Amino acid sequence: MSTLDFNKIGKSYQSVRVLEGIDLQVTAGSRTAIVGPSGSGKTTLLRIIAGFETPDSGKVILQGNPLFDQSTHVPAHKRGIGFVPQDGALFPHFTAAGNIAYGLKGSKQDKARRIDKLMEMVALDRRLAQLWPHEISGGQQQRVALARALGQRPALMLLVEPFSTLDTALRASTRKAVAELLSQANIASILVTHDQSEALSFADQVAVMRAGKLVHVGAPQELYLRPIDEPTATFLGETLILSPNIEPGWPDCALGRVKVDDATRQGQTRIMLRPEQVTITPLPSAHHYPTHCLAKIVSIDFAGFISTLTLSIIEHNEIVAIKTISREGIHVGLMVDLTIMGQAHIFVE
């Protein structure tokens, strides 16, 4: 059963069309990530779901009840939707407990018990309850904001870049904790982010937006390995795009013969590999002939864990750049053997 249904949502600001024909379903307890470049319309879409913006056309339905259609517009505060903004937006004049209590109903004792339960749910130390927002860390502030949103028992949780202000290590652990918490509570969630890796790791469903349209919606691994087009492929991660001539059998390209995910295609086309599909094996000497593809390292861009190797493919006299895990023994001038793992993805023209 779907928690949220979007049907043909459109939105314009004066003559500028920012959303066009948006169809999207979010199932109960699932996690959806909406990604796209700046100006693609993802924030506007989330604001429409929350009730902060009104679409020009279409329908928004939550648990079978219309939030917006030609005759209905439910205001934001009556939608039963939780909202966690980028910076948490905690009330600075309330303690952590006071922020969590905001909007809770019941007696003082009931609220206190509910605050304790919510702090436990988001793994917040009870000793933080009486601290002010500026006295706790960024990760703790985001957990307070999440607890405050959970206190309303929402059917749907909206998360706007909620981890972007955290440092790298804290971002990963907080993201995992939030994902697990929402799943355990069976609360559907929508994350808006510009971080592709964050979207892929958080979500069960990823929706890629471009120029006000949803261009590809599906499971993270499906979108990553079989994107609908080249712009989507490059947006979701590093790519190696090649132009082989496909004949009966495996196509031949700069990296040798490559297995593809659509063997029925023939003729000139473009294929995609992800960098992790290319295994780079150093050769003891230039006279050791590989069984796959011989290349020479012509430059190295070292960036810590990852390095970008610029390679000259000997047989085809072509240059390719491949990102790989940094390791000792790799240097300019080294001859290497390139082996492709798995299938290349063919783009449909």
Swiss-Prot record:
It is a peripheral membrane protein. Pfam families: ABC_tran (PF00005). Keywords: ATP-binding, Cell inner membrane, Cell membrane, Ion transport, Iron, Iron transport, Membrane, Nucleotide-binding, Translocase, Transport. SMART domains: AAA. It comes from the Bacteria. One of its GO terms (molecular function) is ABC-type ferric iron transporter activity. It catalyses: Fe(3+)(out) + ATP + H2O = Fe(3+)(in) + ADP + phosphate + H(+). It is found in: Cell inner membrane. Its EC number is 7.2.2.7. GO terms for cellular component: plasma membrane. Residues 4-236 form the ABC transporter domain. ATP binds at G36, P37, S38, G39, S40, G41, K42, T43. Belongs to the ABC transporter superfamily. Fe(3+) ion importer (TC 3.A.1.10) family. Part of the ABC transporter complex FbpABC involved in Fe(3+) ions import. Responsible for energy coupling to the transport system. The complex is composed of two ATP-binding proteins (FbpC), two transmembrane proteins (FbpB) and a solute-binding protein (FbpA). This is Fe(3+) ions import ATP-binding protein FbpC. It comes from Yersinia enterocolitica. The gene is fbpC.
